[in-house]
Amino acid sequence: MLTSPITTPQFQSRVLALLSSTLSTHTEEDITKTKNASPVTIPSLTPADTPLTPDESISQLIGVTSSWIDLSSPDPIIADVSRQVLKLELAYAAFCGITYALIPGPRLRGQGVSESGFAQYARAIQDALAQGPYMQLYIWLPMIDDSEDQTEEMGDLAPFARPEFLDQVDGETKRLDLFGSWEAWDMIRSICKYPSRLCVALSIPKLLPPVAIQSRWYSEPVRLLTFDAKVFSKNAKGYPVLSRAHQALISRFIRLRSAPWVLLCDVGPIPGQTTDGNGTNVSAPGSAGGFPTLAEAADTNSRPLKDPTPHLSYMRNLQTKQPVQTALDRFGAGYQDYLQTPLQPLTVNLESITYEVFEKDPIKYAWYERAIARALHDWIEQGKPTSNPDGRVVVAVVGAGRGPLVTRALKASEDVGVEIDMWALEKNPNAFVLLQRHNETTWNHRVNLVKSDMRTWRGPIRPANAHQHARRVFNVDGDGEDDNDVAKKNDGEPQSLSVQTTFTGSPSLDSTYLLATSQNPSATPTPYKIDILISELLGSFADNELSPECLDGVQHLLNPVHGISIPASYTAHITPIAAPKLHADIKHGMSSSNPNAAEIPYVVMLNAIDYLSTTPNSETSAASASTTASTNTGTPAPYSEAHTHSQVPQSESQSPASSSSPTPTPTPIIGTTWSFQHPNPSLPQASPSELSNSVPSITNAHNARTSTLTFPIPNRGTCHGIAGYFETVLYKGVELSTNPNTMDAKSEGMISWFPIYFPLKVCDYERSEY
C-alpha cells in the first residue's frame, strides 16, 4: 500500500491566507467571544485542493491528513480551524473510499503544550470518528517524545497562536519524558472510550528506548510501524540495514495476532513514478507517452542493474527470515487475546473436540506419565503395601475424559515394570462410551470402568474370586445403591445379575452400581482403597474448576497411610497487567449482551499485554537466572529405556536461543495467593451423606481463600485487569506451570492451560513509584 496526502499545498495556502486575513482584521478584539459561529470558516474543497478521486486504486491508499494543523493548540481560533480542516479531509476521504487515514499526533513539546491540549485533541478525534463509519484512524505518534522530531515547518499553524493564550500554560517541557508519548495516547483513547477503529501508527527512532517502553507499546493497538530513512544504517556493500535491536522489535510485533504493517518513509521515490508540485503521481522523465528515448534506453542498459528499492527489499528479506514458530505459537495462532469463558466440566458434559484440544499438548501428558512412573517406582522401592491383596498397586483416574491419562498410566506401569489395578471413572455418559471402546480396542480389557460422579463413588470393589483379574464395568446412576445393595435385596437373599460380558455398554437393569462380570453373584464384593489417585481437574487459576472440592470429596477412598495424589499440590498466582485490547473487547463486544461481562473471569492466551509490576532493569537478568536455577529440576529421568518415548523433542520444548531472538521483556513480579494440597491433611470430619450412609459428606468451608497483595509499579500505566496463573507439583520432581517466570524451567511448551484474566470494570491509572 501507498500513502497519499488528502489535500494539496494549494489548500494549505488558502487556509493560511484566510487565517492571516482574519487575525489581522480583528487585532483589537477577541472574536472568539464576539462571534457565535466559528470565527474563521474554511470553505469546501475544490478539485485543486485534493489529488484523490474515487477510483479502483483508492483501496490501496492510506490517506494522510495535514500535518500543519494543530488540534491541541491553546488558541481557540487555531484549534477551531484545525478541526475544520480535519473534518473536511476525512469527509472527502471517506467519500472516495479511503479505509485507512493517518493522522499526525498532538504536539508533545513546545510552547503551549499541556494536558488540556491532549484532551482537546482527543475531542477532535472523537468527532472525526463519526466522519467515516468504516474508516480506521491511525494516530501517528513517536515512540518517545524526542525533541528532535518536534520541529516546526514553514506554514504550520502552531506559530500563529496568539501570545495571550500561550502565557496561560507552561511553555517548555522540563525534562525528557519517556512515557510522555504513550500517556498522550492513553488520554486520547480513554476520552474516545476505546473505539476499535482508533489505532496507533508508531514512529520508530534510530536509538530504541528502554525495553519497558517497547513492551508498553507492544500492548497497544499498533497497526503501523513507520521507519524513516535515517533509522537505517549502511552495511559493507552500501545497502540499508537495521540494527539487531530493531530486528528484534519487528520480530516481536510480527508475532501479534494482528501484526502491524511496516511503512517506509522518505526512502526515495518508487521507480517509474514521481510527483508534481501538488503531490500527484506523474510518469518518469522520457518521451511524451511515458516511454524512454533510444538514448535513454541505451544508457539504462549500459549501467549495471541495482536494486531500485533497497529499503523495501531489505524489509521483505527480513520478513522471510523470521524464526520458525514454536508449537505453542502454532497452536495459539487463533487464540491470542481471545476471551473465552472458563470451562465448567462438573456441570457441563464436554464435547469431544474440547477433549481433543487438551490432548494435543506435547508436554502435559508426558509429564503426567513421568509423575506416575516415579510414584510407582518409589512405591515398590520403598516396600509400601498395596491396597489390593494380590499385590497390584491400585491406580484410579478420576475424570478420565477420553482416556489419555489412563493410557499414560498403563504405559508407565509397563515401563517401570510394576503391575497395577487400573480404574477409570467418568461422569460424562458420552465420553464413557468412548472409554468402553478404548477398553476393547486399545487397553485390552485391562481397565475397570465406572460411570459416576467421583464425589458419590464408593471406590473399587473386589469380588469373592479376586484371584481372577477380570476387568469390570460399573454404572452408578443416582440413587446411591451399589453392588452390595443389589446383592442384599429381597431380605438379604442375593439377587442374580443377568448382564453381558462384552463390555460394550452399561447393563440395562434397575440396579445402580452393577458388576458387569460377576462370576459368583452370591458372594458379597469387598471395597478397597486407592493407592494412587490421578486427576486433571485444574483450571487456569488452579482451583477455578472445583478441583479441591472434587478431590476432597473422593479423598476418603485414598489409602490413608501411603496414598498418593497426582497432582499433590497447586498454587495460584496473580499480577496486574495493562490489556487495552481485552478491555475494549469487553467494553464494546460483550457488555451489550451481558451487563456483567466486566465482572466475570476469562481464559485468555495473553499476548498483547504489558506487565505493570516488574523488577528494576538492573535486577531483571539476575532474577531470571535465579528463577531458572531454583526451579529447573531437570527433565525427570526415565526408569527404563522404553520409558524414553515420553521425552519431548529438543526442537519443540527446549530449543536453544538464537541470535535473532526478540529482546527479553522485563521480569514481572507475580504474587502468590493461595495453595491447596492433596491428600488434604486438614480435611474436616466427614458426616453421613443424605443419599446413603456409606457415602460420606463434608462441607466446603475449609476451601475458602482470601489474599491481599501489594505490587510495586516502576512506571506509570493503566491497569485493565489481573492476570492469573498456577503452578502444580504432580509428584516430587515433576511440576507444571503457567507462571511466566517459571514455565520455561518447569514445563516449557505446555499449551493445555491459558492464563485467567480478571477484568476491572473501571481502569485504574497507576503512577510510578520510582
Language-model-detected regions and their locations in the chain:
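Class I SAM-binding transferase module
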Residues: 1-283, 287-343, 350-352, 359-360, ...
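Buried hydrophobic packing segments
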Residues: 372, 406-409, 554
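Conserved class I S-adenosyl-L-methionine
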Residues: 389-401
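Hydrophobic alpha-helical cores of multi-pass transmembrane domains in eukaryotic membrane proteins
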Residues: 401-402, 534
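Conserved SAM-binding loop of SAM-dependent methyltransferases across substrates and taxa
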Residues: 402-418
